[in-house]
């Protein structure tokens, strides 16, 4: 059996800790003059279910893209391009 490691012996011995006093401040600070009323959820829910009267709003929808009337879409020449590529590949 090998000699005991001094580092492990020191760890097993432990450390002497000083005593400390803690101040627990986790409790809520509510003054004695503060009184919490009962919350009436039923009346709140009925008020929400009734809804609100909304006024009509005029809108000016500008979300459509502005495309000039003279703008045209060019024809798609993809199939002609592929045919040209196939013809050049066959010639090679």
UniProtKB/Swiss-Prot annotation:
Residues 68-79 have a biased composition (Polar residues). Pfam families: WH2. The keyword Cell membrane does not apply. Keywords: Actin-binding, Repeat. Residues 13-33, 54-64 have a biased composition (Basic and acidic residues). It comes from the Eukaryota. Residues 1-33, 54-92 are annotated as: Disordered. Induction: Down-regulated by phagocytic stimuli. One of its GO terms (molecular function) is actin binding. The keyword rRNA-binding does not apply. PROSITE patterns: WH2. Is able to bind two actin monomers at high concentrations of G-actin. Inhibits actin polymerization by sequestering G-actin and stabilizing actin dimers. Monomer. This is Actobindin-A. The gene is abnA.
């Amino acid at each position: 059996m090998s000699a005991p490691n001094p580092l492990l012996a020191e760890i097993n011995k432990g450390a002497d800790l000083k005593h400390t006093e803690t101040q627990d401040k986790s409790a809520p600070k509510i003054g004695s003059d503060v009184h919490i009323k009962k919350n009436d959820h039923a009346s709140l829910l009925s008020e929400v279910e009734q809804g609100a009267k909304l006024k009509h709003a005029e809108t000016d929808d500008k979300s459509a893209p502005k495309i000039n009337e003279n703008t045209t879409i060019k024809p798609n020449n993809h199939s002609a391009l592929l045919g040209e590529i196939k013809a050049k590949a066959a010639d090679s």
